[in-house]
């Protein structure tokens, strides 16, 4: 049965790709194929096409004043998603509508509107929120994790489980590309608010939403990637093209079509697939770095093998917009240390190293009210000892320490002191080390993040872009998917990053030569701000959050005497005031044990305190069959623990991290720049 191309696109699910289409009623100019801006705007009647992928090419954004604006997916602003007001009827509808994967960005969170019986003794209560972490299509189930529980409670739900299930509010910020890839359900629209506009210097995009306020309703516009039976190139066909098609997949062999492969498709191939001789698609519209342009001037290349390259993510330290770099381990330049700044004592504890002591000077005053904990005055010098992690022993059991031990430097000598982890002061590192380090030595010997300056440029590079930076903030090591590609005479080898290079190959045949055994020189890559935030977001999602800070102690320290009237007033106000963070008083009879944090022993790190609205404790019922009861019963024995923890939502942890790592993002919308 014939249908329009737009009807076919809306009804098609990605799991049913590829599909073969027969053009019933075509439209064309001056020939079979006529291209405008890389898209096919005409097809001939009788053409056969194999549709391999459906992607979003742009969004039609409707403003609150009913003005429609076209936004390309490359728009560099950041957006906050509004929760979908339309609930999902069943788990089957969720699995069919959303892309669910191992990345945190691909794991949606829902709220159950009904009680769901999971198994004997377990009930998913109404208003409980859960995250879907994976889909098992063969069994017809989704794997879930109940939120606001510790330890996490995992369970599974069948596709036939009826809801309704409502989407929870997502406090993360996304680019339009991420929204297009992960956050647009099939057949639905999305409401968003822009939280960061493009830089003024970006003349192409900065004016698109300049005078727009309020929410934007995004309607996706799809395009189809297809292959013609008579051509090797990939066709980009807009879904609103006025043609009629018939799905004839059952009548034709999909393998009879030429099979172009993207760089990600090549990377996912098994090891026995390599090495291969491939031809670069001449119809592909891509942008290459200068280092790769010379390699791909010849249309045929040899793809040797895929691998994961180790890269070091670093940012330029400057007042204005900082540049970001991916530095290979093979970089031969030398670095000198630059002083680090620590905003809390917890950051000092995390920077503790086995290789050296850390000398810091306090930049803020801190007056303690707890016995056994030292006060801090601006200008005082401290030494953080190396390779030790502090833990308090209570009745033979190690518990998370709320303090750590360091040394205060005085004129008459050194004095061991203890500082609370939640000390919101400030410390500046004193650097006396004049040695020059390689990038590999820094990552091996010092905990990241770390501050350096290039002292000797890499002489093997024609232009060392790091040498001109005032100083660098080395943030973390990442694994970057790459493929090793060379020209046919093996005179030029390059590591091609998969996630940041848009290439289409037509694999011709297997190559019978031997791949090189030597290491390939890698280039420094400067990445965009959007790419940087994407890398940081996915890296942060894999980091296990530290333990939570302690609650207010049960036995607070003595306070100065007050009048009876003020005591009565303070007593009434404290009974209804919100709980605040306090450090447990140090007990003189407690035994401090220092365990080596590098010998494989389990290390627990308390969280750096940040002022946040704290949710109330969830009370356990006397008896019941819900997941709430099971979770509380498991930890009933630890109710007397001095660390009476409260739950901090993961979205709040993301906000904490963004506060420190994305300080340039203004999370409050402003009419002049945001919507």
Swiss-Prot record:
<dbReference type="GO" id="GO:0002250">
    <property type="term" value="P:adaptive immune response"/>
</dbReference>
<protein>
    <recommendedName>
        <fullName>Protein THEMIS</fullName>
    </recommendedName>
</protein>
<keyword id="KW-0539">Nucleus</keyword>
<dbReference type="GO" id="GO:0043368">
    <property type="term" value="P:positive T cell selection"/>
</dbReference>
<keyword id="KW-1064">Adaptive immunity</keyword>
<feature type="region of interest" description="CABIT 2">
    <location>
        <begin position="253"/>
        <end position="510"/>
    </location>
</feature>
<keyword id="KW-0391">Immunity</keyword>
<dbReference type="Pfam" id="PF12736">
    <property type="entry name" value="CABIT"/>
</dbReference>
<keyword id="KW-0963">Cytoplasm</keyword>
<feature type="region of interest" description="Disordered">
    <location>
        <begin position="543"/>
        <end position="582"/>
    </location>
</feature>
<dbReference type="GO" id="GO:0050852">
    <property type="term" value="P:T cell receptor signaling pathway"/>
</dbReference>
<feature type="region of interest" description="CABIT 1">
    <location>
        <begin position="1"/>
        <end position="252"/>
    </location>
</feature>
<dbReference type="GO" id="GO:0005737">
    <property type="term" value="C:cytoplasm"/>
</dbReference>
<feature type="compositionally biased region" description="Low complexity">
    <location>
        <begin position="566"/>
        <end position="577"/>
    </location>
</feature>
<comment type="similarity">
    <text>Belongs to the themis family.</text>
</comment>
<dbReference type="InterPro" id="IPR025946">
    <property type="entry name" value="CABIT_dom"/>
</dbReference>
<feature type="region of interest" description="Disordered">
    <location>
        <begin position="594"/>
        <end position="643"/>
    </location>
</feature>
<keyword id="KW-0217">Developmental protein</keyword>
<dbReference type="GO" id="GO:0005634">
    <property type="term" value="C:nucleus"/>
</dbReference>
<dbReference type="InterPro" id="IPR039671">
    <property type="entry name" value="THEMIS"/>
</dbReference>
<dbReference type="GO" id="GO:0043383">
    <property type="term" value="P:negative T cell selection"/>
</dbReference>
<comment type="function">
    <text>Plays a central role in late thymocyte development by controlling both positive and negative T-cell selection. Required to sustain and/or integrate signals required for proper lineage commitment and maturation of T-cells. Regulates T-cell development through T-cell antigen receptor (TCR) signaling and in particular through the regulation of calcium influx and phosphorylation of Erk.</text>
</comment>
<feature type="compositionally biased region" description="Basic and acidic residues">
    <location>
        <begin position="625"/>
        <end position="643"/>
    </location>
</feature>
């Amino acid at each position: 049965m014939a249908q329009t191309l737009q009807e076919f696109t809306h009804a098609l699910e990605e799991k049913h790709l590829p599909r073969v289409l027969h053009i019933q009623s075509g439209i064309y100019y001056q020939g079979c194929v006529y291209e405008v801006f890389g898209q096919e705007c005409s097809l001939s009647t009788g053409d056969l096409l194999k549709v391999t992928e459906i992607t979003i090419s742009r969004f039609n954004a409707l403003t609150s004043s009913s003005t429609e604006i076209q936004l390309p997916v490359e728009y560099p602003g950041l957006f906050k998603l509004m929760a979908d007001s339309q609930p999902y009827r069943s788990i089957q509808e969720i699995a069919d509508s959303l892309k669910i994967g191992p990345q945190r960005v691909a794991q949606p969170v829902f709220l159950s509107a009904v009680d769901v019986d999971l198994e004997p003794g377990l009930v998913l209560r109404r208003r409980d929120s859960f995250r879907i972490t994976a889909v098992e299509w063969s069994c017809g189930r989704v794997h879930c994790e109940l939120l606001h529980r510790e330890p996490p409670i995992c369970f599974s739900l069948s596709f036939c489980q009826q809801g309704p299930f409502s989407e929870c509010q997502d406090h993360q910020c996304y680019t339009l590309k991420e929204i297009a890839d992960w956050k647009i359900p099939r057949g639905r629209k999305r409401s968003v608010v822009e939280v960061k506009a493009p830089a003024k210097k970006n003349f192409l995009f900065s004016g698109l939403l300049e005078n727009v306020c309020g929410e934007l309703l995004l309607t996706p516009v799809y395009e189809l990637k297809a292959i013609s039976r008579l051509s090797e190139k990939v066709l980009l066909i807009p879904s609103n093209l006025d043609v009629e098609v018939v799905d004839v997949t059952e009548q034709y062999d999909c393998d009879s079509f030429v099979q172009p492969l993207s760089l990600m498709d090549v990377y996912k191939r098994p090891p026995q697939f390599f090495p291969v001789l491939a031809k670069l698609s001449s119809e592909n519209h891509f942008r290459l770095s200068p280092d790769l342009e010379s390699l791909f001037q010849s249309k045929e290349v040899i793809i040797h093998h895929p691998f994961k390259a180790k890269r070091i993510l670093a940012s330029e330290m400057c007042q204005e917009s900082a540049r970001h770099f991916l530095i290979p381990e093979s970089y031969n330049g030398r670095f000198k240390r630059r002083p680090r700044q620590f905003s809390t004592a917890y950051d000092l504890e995390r920077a503790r190293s086995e290789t050296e002591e850390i000398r810091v000077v306090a930049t803020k005053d801190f007056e303690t009210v707890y016995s056994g904990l030292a006060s801090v005055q601006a200008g005082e010098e401290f030494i953080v000892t190396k390779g030790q992690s502090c833990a308090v022993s209570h009745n033979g059991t190690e518990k998370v320490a709320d303090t750590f031990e360091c040394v205060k430097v005085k004129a008459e000598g050194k004095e061991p002191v203890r500082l609370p982890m939640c000390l919101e002061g400030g410390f500046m590192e004193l650097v006396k080390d004049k040695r020059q380090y390689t990038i590999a030595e820094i990552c091996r010997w010092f905990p990241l993040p770390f501050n350096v300056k290039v002292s000797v440029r890499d002489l093997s590079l024609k232009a060392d872009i790091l040498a001109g930076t005032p100083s660098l903030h080395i943030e973390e090591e990442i694994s970057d998917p790459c493929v090793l590609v060379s020209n046919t005479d093996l005179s030029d080898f390059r590591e091609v990053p998969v996630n940041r290079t848009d290439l289409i190959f037509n694999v011709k045949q297997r190559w019978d030569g031997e791949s090189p055994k030597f290491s390939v020189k890698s280039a420094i890559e400067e990445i965009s701000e959007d790419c940087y935030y994407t890398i940081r977001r996915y890296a942060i999602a894999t980091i296990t959050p530290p333990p939570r800070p302690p609650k207010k102690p049960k036995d607070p320290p003595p306070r100065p005497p007050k009048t009876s009237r003020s005591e009565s007033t303070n007593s009434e106000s404290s009974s209804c005031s919100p709980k605040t963070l306090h450090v447990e008083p140090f007990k003189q009879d407690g035994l401090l044990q220092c365990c080596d944090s590098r010998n494989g022993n389990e290390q627990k790190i308390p969280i750096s305190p940040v002022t946040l609205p704290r949710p109330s404790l969830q009370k356990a019922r006397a008896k019941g069959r819900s997941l709430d009861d099971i979770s509380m019963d498991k930890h009933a024995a630890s109710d007397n623990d001095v660390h009476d923890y409260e739950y901090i939502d993961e979205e709040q942890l993301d906000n904490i991290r963004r506060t420190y790592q994305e300080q340039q993002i203004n999370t409050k919308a402003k009419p002049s720049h945001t919507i």
